[in-house]
From Swiss-Prot:
Its EC number is 2.1.1.74. It is an enzyme of class 2 (transferase). It is found in: Cytoplasm. FAD binds at G7, A8, G9, L10, A11, G12. Belongs to the MnmG family. TrmFO subfamily. InterPro entries: FAD/NAD-bd_sf, MnmG-rel, MnmG-rel_CS, MnmG_N, TrmFO. This is Methylenetetrahydrofolate--tRNA-(uracil-5-)-methyltransferase TrmFO. Its cofactor is FAD. GO terms for cellular component: cytosol. HAMAP family: TrmFO (MF_01037). It holds the Pfam family GIDA. Catalyzes the folate-dependent formation of 5-methyl-uridine at position 54 (M-5-U54) in all tRNAs. It catalyses: uridine(54) in tRNA + (6R)-5,10-methylene-5,6,7,8-tetrahydrofolate + NADH + H(+) = 5-methyluridine(54) in tRNA + (6S)-5,6,7,8-tetrahydrofolate + NAD(+); uridine(54) in tRNA + (6R)-5,10-methylene-5,6,7,8-tetrahydrofolate + NADPH + H(+) = 5-methyluridine(54) in tRNA + (6S)-5,6,7,8-tetrahydrofolate + NADP(+).
């Protein structure tokens, strides 16, 4: 028995590591050092191409909970992180070179893993495979993946607006309404006066943006312009675009506002709302500063900031099962950023689940799902649940399912700790049954 894993990034090494725990051999393909993507520089596995931080260690942060869940499932990424960490306060940061070296050595020393340094241009249809090729998958392999998934279910870049926790919105200023009172009042509206709009506008057009990489320069011309770029065309451009107030009446004044920012429900339970038309390249700190100038969002809690970057990913809700296998090919699994998760640990976590399920598929055992009351389970639930506009998602407490008892707790810190406690109890039980 052998399983093929394509790509030795964070998801790929986790998948390979998880598979070997079942005594199954792995053939791990990695095109480096023969070929590099535009973002990669190191020859080793699990290269951290952006920050060297794996975010917070605190359980009151979803990233902290995700770390603890991953540890319960024998994560090689978490093992490497704690063995190569550098001082970073309450965050877990690593020496990126030692981190990659640690994982590369561990994988290459595993007698069940055969490493092949070659580019894969086609996904085998008749083998059990885990595809974990990342957001910069090569064009030739993407072409084959488009055949597997149908080309309309393949995306080539992110253009995601910020997502806000509904509980953090000030409804003494914001209100529910639909344009022209048509249909149900599905949108949260944040009205602006002329003075408020102009203040927001000038801060928006002068805010710091993320530098555009050479291989991303065409994104601004793909029909999805960042809000700040649109604003630079003229002071009224966005007021006649995503912030147009036509058809909306502020119930407090009985009049149409000068401008309106709308938020649309992002999850079925209505706990998360996305800012309509706010795709952006602003730096995250700038997004928090500038978007909190919007009336009603002064204390907004952003569970995901807006992004626009090159990022190849599949339409997971349409093509993947809850086991992370293709609906059309149950022997082919996907993991990592190519599934539509966002972030280092999020990618690694899906690698663990895909690896476990690929192994159990080979062994003829029932595959596993983690409940959405866990962080890993909530992420997979999010990327495999049908939605109109699927955009990548990172770990956050807003997507984790909670019961009425927890929902009644007003203290946010206490509520998060209770969610974490229940989640880890469930993960511990499942992990003990698996391994």
């Amino acid at each position: 028995m052998r399983i093929t894993v394509i790509g030795a990034g964070l998801a790929g090494v986790e998948a390979a590591n998880a598979i070997t725990k079942f005594g199954i051999k792995v053939r791990l393909y990695e095109m480096k050092p023969k070929k590099f993507s535009p973002a990669h520089k190191q020859e080793g596995f699990a290269e951290l191409v952006c920050s060297n931080s794996l975010k917070s260690k605190l359980l009151t942060n979803a990233s902290g909970l995700l770390k603890e869940e991953m540890k319960l499932f024998g994560s090689i990424v978490m093992e490497a992180a704690y063995n190569t960490q550098v001082e970073a306060g309450q965050a877990l940061a690593v020496d990126r070179y030692l981190f990659s070296e640690y994982i590369t050595k561990k994988i290459k020393q595993n007698p069940l893993i055969e490493v092949i340094h070659e580019e894969v241009t086609e996904v085998p249809r008749d083998e059990v495979v885990v595809v974990s090729t990342g957001p910069l998958t090569t064009e030739s392999l993407l072409e084959d993946i488009s055949k597997l998934c149908n080309s309309k279910n393949l995306y080539f870049f992110d253009a995601a607006a910020p997502i806000v926790l509904k509980d953090s919105i000030d409804f003494s200023k914001a209100f529910f309404a639909s344009r022209y009172n048509k249909g149900t009042d599905d949108y949260i509206n944040c009205p602006m006066t002329k003075e408020e709009y102009e203040r927001f506008y000038y801060e928006l057009v002068n805010a710091e943006v993320i530098e555009v990489k050479d291989f991303e320069r065409d994104l601004l011309f793909e029909g999805c312009m960042p809000i700040e770029e649109m604003a630079k065309r003229g002071i009224d451009t966005i007021r006649f675009g995503p912030l147009k107030p036509v058809g909306i009446i502020d119930p407090k004044t009985g009049k149409m506002p000068y401008a309106v920012v709308q938020l649309r429900k992002d999850t079925q339970d209505g706990r998360l709302y996305n800012m309509v038309g706010f795709q952006t390249r602003l730096k995250w700190g700038e997004q928090k500063r500038v978007f909190r100038l919007i009336p009603g969002l002064e204390n907004a809690e952003f569970v995901r900031y807006g992004v626009m970057h090159k990022n190849s990913y599949i339409n997971s809700p349409q093509v993947l099962t809850k086991f992370l296998s293709l609906k059309k090919y149950p022997n082919i699994f996907f993991a990592g950023q190519i599934t539509g998760v966002e972030g280092y640990l999020e990618s690694a976590a899906t690698g663990i689940v895909a690896g476990i399920n690929a192994a159990r598929y080979v062994l003829g055992r029932a595959q596993i799902t983690l409940p959405p009351s866990t962080c890993i389970g909530a992420l997979i639930e999010y990327i495999t649940t049908p939605k109109k506009d699927f955009q990548p998602m990172n770990a956050n407490y807003g997507i984790i399912s909670i019961d009425e008892e927890i929902a009644r707790i007003k203290d946010k810190e206490k509520r998060k700790l209770l969610i974490a406690e229940k989640s880890l109890s469930v993960c511990r039980e499942i992990a003990n049954q698996i391994f």
